[in-house]
């Protein structure tokens, strides 16, 4: 998204400004079904069987009973995979339900409630303040050199989708377009009118195989440096595909977008980066 240069030495074409809108629309206490009463945990809720957001339905019925003890089940209890393999489904389900049933009361100190995750907690009672629908728009102006033209990128994060924790998108260019999701990439050439779909190798692990991919590339980069084949900066560019500064910038842009969202403003990316990051680095 930061449009790093393809060749070392080229000037990066970075966004000129960005803005963001969004809020927590649905998962608020005011939207809690009246029939749920004062329940703060799914397992003690009178409408658990009818609620589509039941923790028991999500973790136990949808995942564990179908043989999946990995994400998201193992987030509740990291030992659940070993339990399922060694003791069977009944024991694993008993352990998982016990964890999901952990609850608090009105007498529980607020600090204690906030200090830990409650995986069986009512989704409308949670203290989560992450937007369930947010859009970020980044805008580039014409580049000073290299013929890099103006462009716009829009990122939409929404909770209400069949593709939970999956990414999909489209890139519209002057000569064609690219459409992708977590399993395939489709390219369309405007000149020929032809479309072609590619199915890359799917790796295991978290983030759609991204965790394994990053770890592999990091090991390759370290090996290249230790063996004297490349310098650290060269290895990082070749195997990781970005510099440390670009990593920091990509994370910083999230904070800039949040500032834009909260203040309902348009944020100048160069000025924000200078004021919030570079000036502070130089002052320490």
Where are these regions (language model features)?
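Context-gated lysine
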Residues: 11, 29-32, 49, 56-57, ...
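C-terminal helical cap and adjacent loop that interface with cofactors, partners, or active-site loops
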Residues: 120, 126-284
């Amino acid at each position: 998204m930061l449009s790093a240069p393809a060749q070392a030495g080229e000037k990066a074409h970075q966004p000129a400004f960005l803005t963001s809108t969004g809020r927590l629309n649905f998962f608020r206490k005011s939207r809690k079904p009246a029939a749920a009463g004062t329940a703060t945990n799914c397992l003690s809720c009178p409408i658990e069987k009818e609620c589509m957001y039941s923790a028991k339905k999500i973790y136990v019925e949808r995942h564990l009973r179908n043989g999946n003890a990995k994400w998201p089940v193992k987030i509740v209890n990291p030992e659940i995979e070993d339990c399922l393999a060694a003791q069977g489904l009944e024991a694993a389900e008993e352990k998982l339900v016990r964890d999901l049933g952990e609850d608090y009361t009105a007498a529980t100190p607020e600090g204690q409630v906030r200090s830990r995750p409650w995986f069986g907690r009512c989704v409308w009672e949670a203290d989560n303040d992450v937007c369930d629908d947010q859009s970020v728009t980044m805008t580039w102006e014409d580049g000073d050199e290299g013929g890099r033209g103006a462009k716009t990128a829009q990122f939409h994060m929404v909770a209400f989708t069949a593709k939970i924790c999956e990414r999909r998108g489209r890139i519209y260019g002057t000569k064609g377009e690219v459409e992708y999701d977590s399993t395939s990439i489709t390219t369309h050439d405007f000149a020929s009118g032809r479309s072609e779909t590619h199915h890359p190798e799917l790796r295991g692990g978290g983030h759609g195989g991204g965790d394994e991919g990053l770890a592999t590339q990091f090991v390759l980069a370290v090996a290249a440096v230790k063996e004297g084949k490349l310098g650290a900066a060269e290895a990082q560019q070749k195997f990781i595909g970005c510099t440390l500064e670009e990593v920091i910038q990509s994370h910083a842009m999230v904070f800039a977008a949040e500032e834009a969202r909260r203040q309902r403003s348009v944020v100048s990316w160069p000025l924000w980066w200078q004021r919030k990051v570079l000036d502070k680095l130089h002052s320490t």
